[in-house]
């Protein structure tokens, strides 16, 4: 399963490499940042048996903690969810 992070800007004092590395740590063995394009990061959940809600909550918490903008969204299965909702 894939999760897409749609963002308009990175938090202050964070590079894209910082965010990718930290997200890989957050996902641990359950997933990895697999790519992306302009203003989007693609996350691949490697274990189909893991409930995607847990990964969503972990990623959402990380994005809030490091200060992503309020218009940042997570897309799962075609549905976009704001990270501050």
Predicted features by range, described:
Residues 2-5, 23, 43, 59, ...:
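Hydrophobic beta-strand residues in large extracellular and virion-surface proteins
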Residues 25-34, 64-70:
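Structural alpha-beta junctions
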Residues 60-84:
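Conserved short beta-strand edge segments in small beta-sheet-based binding/regulatory domains
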């Amino acid at each position: 399963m894939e999760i897409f992070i749609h963002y308009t800007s990175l938090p202050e004092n964070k590079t894209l490499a910082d965010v990718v590395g930290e997200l890989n740590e957050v996902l641990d063995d359950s997933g990895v940042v697999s790519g992306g394009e302009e203003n989007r990061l693609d996350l691949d959940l490697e274990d189909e048996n893991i409930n995607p809600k847990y990964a969503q909550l972990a990623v959402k918490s990380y994005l809030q903690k490091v200060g992503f903008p309020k218009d940042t969204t997570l897309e799962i299965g075609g549905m976009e969810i704001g990270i501050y909702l």
